[in-house]
Every structure is written in structure tokens, then in C-alpha cells.
Amino acid sequence: MPNQHMLLLSNLLPVGLNISTWWNFGSMLLTCLALQITTGFFLAIHYTANINLAFSSIIHITRDVPHGWIMQNLHATGASMFFICIYIHIARGLYYGSYLNKGVWLSGTILLITLMATAFFGYVLPWGQMSFWAATVITNLLTAVPYLGTPLTTWLWGGFSINDPTLTRFFALHLILPFAIISLSSIHIILLHNEGSSNPLGXNSDIDKIPFHPYHSHKDALMLTILITLLFIILSFTPNIFNDPENFSKANPLVTPQHIKPEWYFLFAYGILRSIPNKLGGTLALILSVTILLTVPFTHTSYVRSMTFRPLAQLMFWTLIATFMTITWAATKPVEPPFTIIGQTTSILYFSFFIINPLLGWLENKIMITH
């Protein structure tokens, strides 16, 4: 009888035979989310959301709390792993045309925005130098909004500068947003299972499906093992590899760091913001760097879903990946030549992908019809 139930359960989720390892990142993201919520809960128990005590409470967690250093480092490194997985997940969606499942893609983009907001609020909490100044710079962008900018910024800060009320509300938001992420993830997964996964060929999977368990579940288990092993290797040997040296000093509003920059996973957006000399223009470009993903399902022109059989589109896709990495690198450098021109060039290339790709689809259609 139990075997019958197991058979029924495994056959309830038939999955395309040929989906590759790139399809495993969804389950890895779910694992990252569970890890972040668990470690975050234990950190929240010992954390104090007060500008005089926040920095000391982090030191207290790492030094005095039993296994606190593991929790703190897992939470910080886990965030980087989360973003590595989500960027690969999005790249796979762009390459294999998964965005044509509109509900899944749009809910996923909203998930990305929520995740970025959560990570930003979390970066402010240790109240180190870079935490404070990154929060000052990013929240100050709200002042670029015509008419409403200044009152909006004052409302967000809870005063006329970043102070105790700001830290308290950022902690509250950092605590509540992961639950919004859980809800959005549930919607994302429900919408996915409504239509089913795409596959590397972009063809219909209905003709050849296999049970999710044991085939794909074992593939998931392998990738999760690699993820957790990598996480613990970083944790054991280079736990501060993703941290900024400035953040080991307590926040000082009177001393500005030589080069203010956010965490590495925001550097591509920060690089785009920095490459436009106008404040409002830069803010709009920053917002557009993520929200432009919402347009992708509506600008798909090719008859072929996946890029597997589209060499011209592949060229543009890999240019986008190289561009993304170059912007990230350029944003770590000071605002001076040649980094300014590199930032501006790569920003133009980044947005050009979303304009050129539909044109390439149209061109490929023409070539296919004539041949």
C-alpha cells in the first residue's frame, strides 16, 4: 500500500525528459531561502536594533553566542549564494525562453525585486561604515523624485537624517519581507506547475515525460550537496570573502569612506546608476536595470522559443553576460577614467540586449522563411 502511494505521488509530477542541470537552480533557491530564514531567526534573537548597540551585538553574536559565528557567516555568505543562484536562474530563463510562461516570469521578477529590497535592508543592520553610507546614498536617491522626493525620504528615514528610527524600521522590514518572499515563491511554483517547465530544445515536453522522483529528485540532491559543500568550504577557509573591509569599523557619520559601494550583487545596478551624471536619470536607469526584465515576454519575436537554435541571439546573450560581469567589476573602482567610460559603454550594451534581441528574432524569422 505505501508503495502505491509513492508511485501515485511520483506520477503526479511528470517532468520533461531532457531538462538539464540549469533547471536545478529553483530548488537550490528554495534551499537558500530556508537557510536564510533559519539562520536569520537565530541572529534576530541576539541582535539589537539600536544605533549604539547594533555593531556591538554583531560582535557579541560572533564571539560569545555558542555557534554564533557559524550563524552570522552562514547568513552573510548564504545571501551571496542566493544571488549567484538567482542570477543563473534568470540567465537560464532568458536563454531557453522560459519567459514565455508569462505568469511565472512576472512573478519571478517581482520576487527578484523583493529579494533585492530584503538584502539591502539586511546590509544596513550591522551598522558598519559601509552599511551606513550605502544606506545614506541609496535612500537619498528618493530625493530625485519631483515634488514628493524630500517628504518621502524624511518619511523613510523617520527623521531628517539616517538615525535610530531608520535602523529600527529597516530591521522590521528585513524581518517581514522573507515571509512575503515565501508567499510569492508559492505563487511562482503554482503558476509553473500550471503549465509545466520548458526544456533546452524549447519544444513541447508532453510527448516524452518521466516521473520527477527518482530521476530529477536525485539530480536536485546532487546540486544541493554541491551548494552546501561550497558554502561550508567558504565558511571554513575564507568566511569574509564577500565582506567589505570598511564594514568592520563602526558607522561614523563624520567620516566618509573613500569609495562607497554596495554588496557585490548590487554592483551591476550601482554601476548603471553611476554611469549617468544626472541624479533623476541615474535613479530611473537603476530601477530600469531590473524592471526591464518585465518587458522580455512581450518583446519576443522569434518563431523559436529557445536560443539553442538561434546563433545570433546566442551571441547577444553571451555579450549580455560579459557586460553584466564588466559592469560589476567597473562599479568596484573609483569614479575616474577609464572606469567611467567602461561603465557608460557597458550600461549601453546592457540595455541594448533588450532592444536588439527582438530585432534579431525578426531577422532570424526572415532567414528561416527564405531558406
UniProtKB/Swiss-Prot annotation:
Binding site for heme b b562: 75, 174
Sequence positions that bind heme b b566: 89, 188
Superkingdom field: Eukaryota
Compartment list: Mitochondrion inner membrane
Annotated GO biological process: mitochondrial electron transport, ubiquinol to cytochrome c
Membrane-spanning ranges: 25-45, 69-90, 105-125, 170-190, 218-238, 280-300, 312-332, 339-358
Keywords: Electron transport, Heme, Iron, Membrane, Metal-binding, Mitochondrion, Mitochondrion inner membrane, Respiratory chain, Transmembrane, Transmembrane helix, Transport, Ubiquinone
InterPro entries in UniProt: Cyt_b/b6_C (IPR005798), Cyt_b/b6_C_sf (IPR036150), Cyt_b/b6_N (IPR005797), Cytb/b6-like_sf (IPR027387), Cytochrome_b (IPR030689), Cytochrome_b_C_euk/bac (IPR048260), Cytochrome_b_N_euk/bac (IPR048259), Di-haem_cyt_TM (IPR016174)
Gene Ontology molecular functions: metal ion binding; ubiquinol-cytochrome-c reductase activity
GO CC annotations, alphabetized: mitochondrial inner membrane; respiratory chain complex III
Binding note for cofactor: Binds 2 heme b groups non-covalently.
Its membrane topology: Multi-pass membrane protein
Pfam families: Cytochrom_B_C (PF00032), Cytochrome_B (PF00033)
Binding-site list for a ubiquinone: 193
Coiled coil: none
Secretion signal span: none
CDD domains linked to this entry: cytochrome_b_C, Cytochrome_b_N
Cofactor: heme b
Subunit structure: The cytochrome bc1 complex contains 3 respiratory subunits (MT-CYB, CYC1 and UQCRFS1), 2 core proteins (UQCRC1 and UQCRC2) and probably 6 low-molecular weight proteins.
Miscellaneous comment: Heme 1 (or BL or b562) is low-potential and absorbs at about 562 nm, and heme 2 (or BH or b566) is high-potential and absorbs at about 566 nm.
Family classification: Belongs to the cytochrome b family.
Its job: Component of the ubiquinol-cytochrome c reductase complex (complex III or cytochrome b-c1 complex) that is part of the mitochondrial respiratory chain. The b-c1 complex mediates electron transfer from ubiquinol to cytochrome c. Contributes to the generation of a proton gradient across the mitochondrial membrane that is then used for ATP synthesis.
Record protein name field: Cytochrome b
Species of provenance: Farancia abacura (Mud snake)
Native organism taxonomy: Eukaryota, Metazoa, Chordata, Craniata, Vertebrata
Gene giving rise to this polypeptide: MT-CYB
